[in-house]
């Protein structure tokens, strides 16, 4: 009898967990109607209506799961889905938003634009009445499933800044002036396009600056009458990262820049202009313009009143926008203030599985304030205005239960981001702890792949015990920004582990294309079993920090140097042991590696060009006499095929001598079906384009 009761209990729990046979079901269809009851044969049309119906069902029966099942098709979202504490489920009766089995379900936050006509063979136009009559101006346009280029000058690349001068209007009490005007001096040939600007051009056009790790986006106030220069205004420039003669810029969104295939321009009277790409016709080209900036808002009240136990499964959210404020955007590392199309506050046990987020103006997801035990798994995030996933707040809270923790991002593809905010990050952890970022494929971004921590220096930081494992992070930077890392850390991070990651092809504009990068105050971090290659400045760099352990890694083929350190401090900065450093160009060490306080031993160094490896100005023997690397070796690890990036070690004698433990770096990245893994793979066209960026910049440097 006990056995029978146990079996029955197991069956009941199974069905409750699966949320299927015993669930209360609400159906959605593109052909539905929100006045329907939400049955399979009389479905609803929108998610807000389904949410409202779910609230009624929960009030009548809170013991059964509620499933909102979307049938095949495309759904136009006219407003975001907003969930609050009243929508919370329980562990055994969650609320589930999912696609019907086998269905392709797309929620679109934008409308299709029709009515194009030819102005001539190389220019089309359409009238968009919503822009003319309802102030529905948009700044992104998606054409046949790709992000089209807003008219810009130059069409590719950047113009140089020759000089920037600042006049402070109001100093304020902060680290930078509160109000200031900047005069940007440029080449006369680069300013000719904007000398005839109308008042409307000044209101609409955006000049975008790239300076080190930041971007500044501003309107042009006026042009100088005495020299090739223009004026912008807003906050004062950051003394630690101002616009200067090393900065670059381009300008977009004025009709005079509309001159290249694939570009578009929208004027304030409602006329949309587009130059078609080869092969595009009015009949075979579909245009979508965003009307929403976000898809989902999940908002609890407090740590004691969270939104909990909600699942999203196999849904696609696509086409969302971003409208630039009239004052533009001040620079911000990692595009930290920029929102996301899905935002959660005071949320627990919320999961996103098998979902797709694409064609956005901002980040993908943000687990912001007071979130815990949430997950994102097997999701595909691409064509992003900013980055992929944000965890935690930039504001430091005093109450522990206000701090986001235990968020899992596993087996996701995050690629092709930074289209509006190039300084955005693939996955970033601000003030948050105990998170796990595993098996993610992160690529084709203009800044860092993963970032953890948000305190500069040794002050208290709640960002601890974060796990970054088995991620494949590659093709970052693209020669556009500086000061980036495949994995980037900040502040006291005791218990944080960065291991088993495959990081390669990180290329900055000037300095700062690093694989593993422990920046200001990084403390208590273990980095082990990582393979890092083809990074511009070095495979590993520590700006400053203490008691970080860098062990059992392979650093190979990095371009300028292999190892780098900047600030020399009295305490021990790192322990560097059991690593293999293999290179064929550049130097072994750069900056102050030879000066700062480190324990370095049981490493293998090999320069394929010579057996005389130099440690800054020292020979190996001189280096050892200084107390470093006394048990290390200069030896060929005999990788299987390093030219094709096969770094399996064959020289087991060397491995044993330095206590190196081989690791399987092929396990990094996404897992599952061949189709899923293929989706995450970088196409050869992207690799070739990236290689051309590297070759072009390296050739310029040598000149």
Model-inferred region functions:
Residues 79-86, 92, 96, 524-646:
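Predominantly extracellular beta-rich ligand-binding scaffolds that present long acidic/polar faces
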Residues 25-351, 356, 397-401, 626-628, ...:
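Extracellular polysaccharide-degrading/modifying enzymes targeting complex plant/algal/animal polysaccharides
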Residues 69, 76, 82, 96-98, ...:
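Extracellular beta-strand solenoid repeats
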Residues 236-243, 252, 280-300, 305, ...:
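Beta-propeller domains
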Residues 24, 64-66, 73, 79, ...:
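The right-handed parallel beta-helix/beta-solenoid scaffold, focusing on the short coil/turn
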Residues 1-24:
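Bacterial Sec-dependent N-terminal signal peptides
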Residues 308-319, 348-359, 371-386, 399-418, ...:
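Right-handed parallel beta-helix
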Residues 79-80, 321-327, 361-367, 385-391, ...:
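Short glycine/acidic-rich loop motifs that flank beta-strands on beta-rich extracellular proteins
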């Amino acid at each position: 009898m006990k056995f029978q009761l146990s079996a029955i209990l197991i069956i009941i729990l199974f069905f409750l967990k699966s949320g299927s046979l015993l669930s209360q079901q609400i159906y959605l269809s593109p052909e539905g109607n929100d006045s329907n009851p939400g049955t399979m044969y009389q479905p609803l049309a929108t998610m807000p209506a389904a949410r409202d119906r779910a609230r009624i069902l929960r009030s009548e029966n809170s013991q059964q799961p509620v499933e909102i099942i979307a049938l095949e098709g495309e759904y136009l979202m006219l407003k975001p889905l907003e969930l609050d504490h009243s929508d919370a489920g329980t562990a055994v009766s969650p609320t589930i938003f999912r696609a019907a089995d086998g269905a392709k379900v797309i929620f679109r936050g934008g409308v299709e634009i029709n009515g194009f006509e030819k102005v001539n063979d190389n220019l089309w136009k359409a009238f968009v009445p919503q822009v003319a009559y309802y102030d529905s101006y948009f700044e992104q346009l998606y054409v046949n499933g790709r992000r089209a280029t807003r008219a810009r000058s130059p069409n590719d690349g950047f113009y140089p800044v020759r000089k920037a001068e600042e006049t402070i209007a109001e100093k304020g009490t902060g680290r930078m002036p509160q109000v200031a005007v900047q005069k940007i001096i440029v080449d006369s040939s680069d300013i000719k396009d904007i000398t005839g600007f109308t008042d409307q051009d000044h209101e609409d056009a955006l000049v975008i600056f790239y300076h080190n790790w930041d971007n500044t986006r501003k309107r042009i106030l006026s042009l100088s009458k005495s020299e090739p220069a223009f004026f912008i205004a807003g906050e004062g420039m950051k003394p630690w990262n101002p616009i200067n003669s090393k900065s670059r810029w381009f300008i977009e969104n004025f009709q005079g820049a509309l001159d290249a295939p694939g570009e578009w321009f929208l004027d304030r009277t409602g006329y949309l202009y587009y130059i078609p790409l080869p092969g595009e016709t009015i009949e075979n080209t579909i245009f979508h313009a965003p009307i929403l900036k976000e898809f989902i808002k999940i908002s609890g009240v407090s740590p004691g009143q969270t939104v909990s136990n909600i699942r999203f499964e196999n849904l696609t959210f696509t086409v969302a926008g971003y409208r630039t404020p009239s004052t533009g955007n001040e620079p911000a590392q990692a595009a930290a203030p920029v929102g996301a199309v899905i935002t959660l506050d005071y949320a627990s046990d919320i999961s996103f599985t098998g979902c797709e987020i694409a064609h956005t103006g901002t980040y993908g997801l943000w687990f912001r304030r007071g979130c815990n035990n949430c997950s994102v798994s097997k999701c595909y995030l691409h064509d992003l205005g900013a980055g992929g996933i944000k965890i935690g707040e930039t504001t430091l809270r005093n109450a522990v239960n206000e701090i986001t923790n235990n968020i899992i991002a596993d087996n996701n593809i995050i690629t092709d981001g930074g289209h509006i905010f190039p300084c955005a990050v693939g996955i970033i952890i601000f003030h948050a702890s105990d998170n796990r970022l595993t098996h993610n494929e992160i690529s084709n971004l203009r800044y860092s792949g993963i970032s953890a921590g948000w305190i500069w220096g040794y002050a208290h930081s709640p960002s601890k015990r974060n796990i970054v494992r088995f991620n494949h992070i590659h093709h970052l930077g693209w020669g556009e920004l500086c000061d980036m890392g495949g994995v980037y850390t900040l502040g006291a991070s005791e218990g944080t582990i960065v291991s088993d990651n495959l990081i390669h092809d990180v290329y900055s504009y000037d300095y700062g294309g690093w694989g593993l990068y422990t920046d200001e105050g990084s403390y208590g971090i273990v980095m082990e079993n990582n393979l890092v290659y083809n990074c511009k400045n070095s495979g590993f760099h520590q700006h400053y920090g203490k008691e970080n352990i860098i062990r059992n890694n392979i650093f190979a083929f990095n371009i300028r140097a292999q190892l780098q350190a900047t600030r020399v401090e009295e305490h021990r900065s790192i322990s560097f042991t059991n690593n293999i450093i293999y290179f064929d160009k550049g130097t072994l060490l750069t900056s102050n590696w030879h000066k700062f306080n480190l324990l370095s031993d049981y490493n293998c160094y090999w320069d394929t060009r010579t057996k005389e490896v130099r440690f800054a100005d020292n020979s190996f023997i001189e280096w050892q006499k200084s107390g470093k690397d006394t048990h290390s070796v200069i030896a060929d690890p005999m990788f299987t095929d390093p030219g094709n990036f096969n770094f399996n070690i064959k020289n087991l004698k060397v491995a044993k001598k330095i206590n190196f433990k081989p690791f399987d770096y092929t396990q990094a990245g996404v897992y599952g079906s061949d189709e899923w893994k293929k989706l995450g793979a970088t196409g050869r066209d992207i690799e070739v384009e990236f290689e051309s960026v590297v070759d072009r910049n390296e050739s310029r440097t040598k000149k």
